[in-house]
Amino acid sequence: MKEKLIYSRTCVYNINYHVVWSVKYRRKILSAEIEIYLKELVQKIASDKGFTVHLFEVGEGDHIHCFVSAPPKLSVTDIVKYLKGITGRKLFEKYPAIRQKLWKGQLWNHSYYVETIGSVSEENIRRYIEHQSKSY
């Protein structure tokens, strides 16, 4: 686990998320060409905003899976806002034809799924915390 730790000036952390979001109306518009562009764009966004995208894949042409690590100063809602907002705007600029397959000028569904990814199980954390008071 120590090799996964990230050291900053004020803290040590290992914060990882699995984020999933979909195209509005689940339209299958994410072609192989768009996927290549998206992967490059997402890496640039992550670099500019201060987080890391370890893995990014398009599923079935209509949704995204993303494995992200971030410092504690970045909330997952901010990360999703950056990823969905910037990619949506840039995709419409580069591929204006996809706008015709969607209504109201929105590429992504409003909602998203997120879960934390850790190297220690919930059970181990509970056991560790419960045993803290017993060590005195």
Model regions: which residues?
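Basic nucleic-acid-binding interfaces
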Residues: M1-Y136
